[in-house]
């Protein structure tokens, strides 16, 4: 799930990425906003409900592709993304519009 909160400057938006992943040991959000670096933006698990979450400030008016990397072995999309596009590997990437 994506939550977008405009920042006071009007030039950036705080994007909170959330993924229910009960039983997962690790989740990262990976996309063109971080060079597809699997280690750049790990999500933290909330103890009460098992949802993994992280926030990133991104420039307004941009379009980003991303996916979640779970337990260093599988990809998953955000099913509340703004859109989806084929990624060239026979799957789709999630799309975020800021």
Positions of PLM-derived features:
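Extracellular ectodomain segments of secreted/surface proteins
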Residues: 1-12
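Aromatic-rich carbohydrate-binding modules that target alpha-glucans
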Residues: 11-61, 71-98
């Amino acid at each position: 799930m994506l939550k977008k909160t405009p920042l006071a400057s009007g030039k950036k938006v705080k994007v909170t990425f959330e993924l229910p992943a009960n039983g997962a040991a690790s989740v990262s959000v990976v996309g063109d906003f971080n060079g597809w670096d699997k280690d750049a933006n790990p999500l933290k698990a909330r103890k009460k409900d098992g949802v993994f979450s992280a926030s990133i400030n991104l420039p307004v008016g941009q379009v980003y592709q991303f996916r979640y990397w779970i337990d260093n072995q599988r990809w998953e999309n955000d099913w509340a993304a703004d859109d989806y596009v084929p990624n060239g590997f026979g799957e789709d990437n999630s799309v975020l519009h800021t």
